[in-house]
Amino acid sequence: MMKKIKLTRANKSITLKALALYYYQQRALGHNTQESGRLILKINSLPADKKASFSAEEIFLMRSTINQLRNDQLAKGQYTDAADDMLLKLF
């Protein structure tokens, strides 16, 4: 199932930040990074403020990585507005 999501510049930025942290963590552990790497390249190539189609697996990966980033920001006492906005789009 494909879902169309409009990505603003802030949405792209927070998603790429979350995916990059996940990518480097998985690479350090020696796990497969092909799926997350492909998604990073896909999101990076998208123009801002345009709708893009994402599969259920891609949405799950984005949702889980952004949620982890949000939890890390909350633990540090940082603002989570950008992560919250993107999470709402993914549900």
Each predicted region: which residue ranges?
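Positively charged, low-complexity terminal tracts
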Residues: 1-91
